């Protein structure tokens, strides 16, 4: 199960229907405690905001981009941890990303999600890539384990915390980084208040047993 806890909008809304500049939307979501009503997700509203993609030529709206196949976690169920940067891992260069992003934008892509098998923040050019997306007014989001604190300005930033204490984190993630990730989340939340208030910061949990949800909270 994948449980996502959002402070403001969901990632899909950030990159699809709603703009972070919409003040009425922000007030509405704050009044709801930061959660969308369930029917909102099944009415087709997000798709209807892209009616040209339904009635016209079928084109992608968002693009997920893997910046690297290297990860600094060692999850026992994942293959990406076996790659090392100096022994077969690959990372997309800044120059190549720009080429691909411009081509995708020309096709009609409106938003980008920096994600992966690998951990996107490990890419040596990550901050340059993130800066370029922001400077060129692209809507973009990122999924990260947040072992590394980065001060960037996406529309949404989703952290895979996944555990509820040091022991459970190390069991799931293969590294002892639970407290470090928590501190990075706190530091980013404080930083974004002044520097990127429009960013929706969320946390997701990997649930093995229903009881884990109670422990997480």
Which ranges hold each PLM region?
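Conserved alpha-helical substructure of the radical SAM core
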Residues: 34-156, 167, 171-172, 179, ...
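Conserved phosphate-donor/acceptor-positioning beta-strand/loop module used by diverse small-molecule
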Residues: 159-161
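Conserved strand-turn element in the central/C-terminal portion of the radical SAM core barrel
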Residues: 185-213
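Short Gly/Ser/Thr- and charged-rich N-terminal loops/segments
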Residues: 12, 16
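Acidic/polar hotspots within intrinsically disordered regions
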Residues: 2-5
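Short, electropositive alpha-helical surface patch
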Residues: 131-133, 208-217
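Short, Lys/Arg-enriched N-terminal segments with co-localized hydrophobic residues
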Residues: 25-37
